[in-house]
């Protein structure tokens, strides 16, 4: 039978005995812990920081206020924001970036120098020994050629020649030689042993140089040539040159030395000459002058020695050295520093040395410029060049592209100097033939190269960084341009420093640009030093015309024997240059013959009234020597007069030359200044 209501077995629950004291402590700890839970509803927070329970009023006024960025963004049209976003994405480049590397053409051929070195000099010590031997061979050959070119050139009877630059001369421009030229003596009966460099025909004067009523510009300053009159000296071709002629260009013009090799010889001062011929000889043009000049010179026959400018023979050891370093070196530091050092000293001492009369002085200048140049080189190597040369094994391509371009830049005086731009100034670009088209071509080439390099930066994902760097460069240049009283001048060494960071890729175009810019930097520092990027107008002009106020000259009396000029009143204020002139200087045949000031009555013909209508009388040259009027007229030599104001000891622009003809007639000055 089933027993539905029958109770089951009893369940026994055993409750353990609890310690009331322990339980109390447990509950107390839990309560304390719960107080420090980091919740917004924590009611245990007291004081001013306690959160109040939100009310309906709070919920109605709690709309979030937009930030200023959001307010500006809301006002920008969506099409602009989309375009900006796409531009930013494009500038950042592909993801992941693609890093340029050069895969050599004909790798077996290009790796042959490295394989040869691995086979015969596998150990590091062996390679260091070979490198040291190469350094020693270059230094020895370079030093011997330099010694032969500079020291071993004594001229018997005259001693060691003085080293001249292509623009060396006796007579200075304007009134720099003083009244009657006394600061540029001697005029005659003295000789000078000299040495001239090669290729002086390429050196041209940038500012107009006055020769009577003519001007020489963009060609060598040579006045004279073979003369009809005898000088009393045994001169080469009886060629006589005016004292303001460039000595080395005149020596080439006379046929005394070769323009290709330069040379040594002896110059003889021949005093005053009545006139000077002209004409082109040995690719050097000469300007004639139809009147007298107190100082002249020629070149003594039989004094030419076998000394030569060995810049081309000295190129061979340095060129071979750089080629060997490039072919057999994969270490970027060894490659860069070896080539940089030898290029620098080759330019500074051989191919384009600065002007200095002794080689000891030349070496001193070279070392003085080398240390700061080396610091700049370290910066560009560390942040630009090292990236291009690291792991580059295309030895032949590296030699042709990088080293070849470096030589093109370092020999700037034979490569880019042929471009008809002497200085990047508005005056020169306007005045020099061919300068404007050349500048346009250069700018277009730079733009094309810059676009190509910008694309490479984008491909490598580095465009944003370099846009910032070059933006900073541009901003700095704009600030420099805005500084009053100074002019911005970008020298070619500065161009190298600015553009070198933009070549930090390992691709073939960048190797060419990098080598070229490094060569330009080396040439700029070794030849000219760290010329300032900001120059004063006076320093930038360097003998150019100032566009100053010119004297208003009148003829008061004139005859065949003398002439009297009215010079106006002094002092005179020049509002354009903000300068007050208290004196006047007069050049006769490009020699200062008078210098007078407003406070000195002694100098003027009419000393009774100071400051008013100054006059000055000049007697024709030769009258003081006892020659009669008929003798003076028969000689037929005109005289050329130029007038310029002075402020203290500083002269302003001179007028163009007025001509006092031998028959007593006067030809007025053309408008405009001269120098």
Whereabouts are the PLM-identified features?
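Interhelical loop segments of eukaryotic multi-pass membrane proteins
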Residues: 147-170, 338-345, 357-365, 389-396, ...
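Short hydrophobic alpha-helical membrane-embedded segments
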Residues: 109-112, 116, 292-296, 309-319, ...
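Hydrophobic alpha-helical transmembrane segments corresponding to the first two to three helices
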Residues: 293-430, 435-452
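Multi-pass membrane glycosyltransferase architecture that uses lipid-linked
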Residues: 319, 346-353, 511-543
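Generic detector of multi-pass transmembrane helix bundles and their immediately adjacent loops
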Residues: 385-532
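Soluble extramembrane domains flanking the early transmembrane region of eukaryotic membrane proteins
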Residues: 2-3, 7-316, 632-639, 647-675
């Amino acid at each position: 039978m089933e027993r539905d209501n029958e109770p089951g077995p009893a369940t026994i629950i055993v409750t353990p005995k609890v310690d009331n004291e322990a339980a109390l402590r447990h509950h107390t700890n839990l309560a304390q812990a719960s107080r420090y839970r980091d919740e917004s509803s924590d009611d245990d927070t007291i004081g001013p920081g306690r959160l109040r329970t939100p009310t309906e009023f709070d919920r109605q006024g709690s709309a979030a206020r937009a930030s200023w960025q959001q307010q500006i963004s809301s006002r920008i049209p969506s099409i602009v924001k989309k375009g900006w976003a796409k531009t930013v994405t494009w500038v950042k480049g592909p993801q992941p970036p693609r890093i340029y590397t050069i895969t050599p053409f004909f790798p077996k051929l290009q790796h042959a120098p490295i394989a040869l070195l691995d086979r015969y000099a596998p150990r590091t010590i062996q390679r260091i020994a070979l490198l040291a031997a190469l350094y020693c061979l270059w230094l020895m050959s370079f030093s011997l050629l330099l010694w032969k070119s500079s020291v071993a050139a004594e001229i018997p009877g005259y001693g060691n020649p003085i080293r001249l630059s292509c623009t060396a001369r006796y007579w200075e421009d304007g009134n720099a030689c003083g009244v009657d030229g006394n600061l540029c003596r001697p005029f005659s009966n003295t000789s000078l042993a000299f040495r001239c460099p090669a290729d002086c025909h390429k050196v041209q004067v940038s500012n107009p140089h006055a020769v009577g009523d003519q001007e020489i510009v963009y060609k060598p300053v040579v006045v004279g040539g073979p003369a009809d009159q005898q000088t009393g000296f045994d001169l080469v071709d009886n060629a006589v040159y005016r004292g303001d002629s460039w000595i080395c260009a005149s020596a080439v013009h006379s046929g005394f030395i070769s323009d290709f090799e330069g040379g040594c010889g002896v110059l003889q001062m021949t005093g005053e000459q009545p006139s000077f011929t002209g004409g082109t000889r040995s690719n050097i043009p000469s300007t004639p002058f139809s009147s007298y000049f107190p100082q002249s010179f020629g070149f003594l026959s039989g004094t030419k020695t076998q000394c030569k400018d060995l810049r081309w023979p000295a190129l061979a050891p340095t060129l071979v050295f750089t080629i060997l370093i490039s072919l057999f070196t994969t270490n970027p530091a060894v490659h860069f520093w070896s080539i940089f050092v030898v290029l620098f000293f080759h330019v500074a001492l051989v191919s384009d040395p600065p002007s200095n009369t002794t080689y000891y002085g030349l070496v001193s200048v070279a070392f003085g410029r080398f240390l700061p140049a080396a610091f700049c080189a370290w910066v560009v190597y560390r942040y630009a060049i090292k990236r291009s040369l690291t792991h580059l094994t295309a030895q032949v391509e590296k030699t042709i592209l990088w080293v070849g371009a470096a030589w093109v830049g370092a020999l700037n005086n034979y490569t880019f100097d042929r471009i008809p731009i002497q200085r990047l100034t508005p005056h020169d670009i306007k005045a020099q033939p061919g300068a404007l088209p050349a500048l346009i071509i250069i700018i277009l080439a730079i733009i094309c190269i810059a676009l190509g390099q910008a694309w490479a930066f984008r491909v490598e994902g580095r465009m944003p960084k370099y846009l910032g760097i070059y933006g900073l460069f541009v901003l700095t240049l704009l600030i420099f341009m805005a500084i009053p009283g100074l002019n911005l001048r970008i020298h070619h060494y500065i161009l190298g420093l600015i553009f070198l960071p933009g070549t930090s890729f390992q691709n073939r175009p960048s190797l060419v640009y990098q080598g070229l810019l490094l060569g330009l930097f080396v040439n700029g520092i070794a030849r000219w030093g760290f010329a300032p990027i900001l120059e004063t107008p006076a320093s930038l002009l360097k003998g150019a015309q100032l566009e100053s106020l010119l004297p208003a000259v009148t003829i008061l009396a004139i005859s065949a024997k003398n002439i009297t000029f009215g010079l106006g009143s002094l002092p005179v204020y020049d509002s354009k240059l903000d300068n007050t002139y208290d004196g006047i200087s007069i050049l006769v045949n490009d020699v200062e013959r008078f210098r007078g000031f407003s406070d000195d009555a002694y100098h003027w013909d009419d000393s009774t009234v100071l400051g008013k209508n100054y006059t000055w009388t000049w007697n024709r040259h030769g009258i003081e020597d006892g020659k009669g009027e008929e003798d003076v007229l028969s000689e037929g030599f005109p005289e050329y007069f130029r007038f310029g104001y002075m402020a203290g000891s500083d002269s302003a622009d001179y007028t163009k030359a007025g001509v006092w003809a031998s028959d007593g007639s006067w030809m007025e000055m053309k408008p405009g200044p001269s120098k």
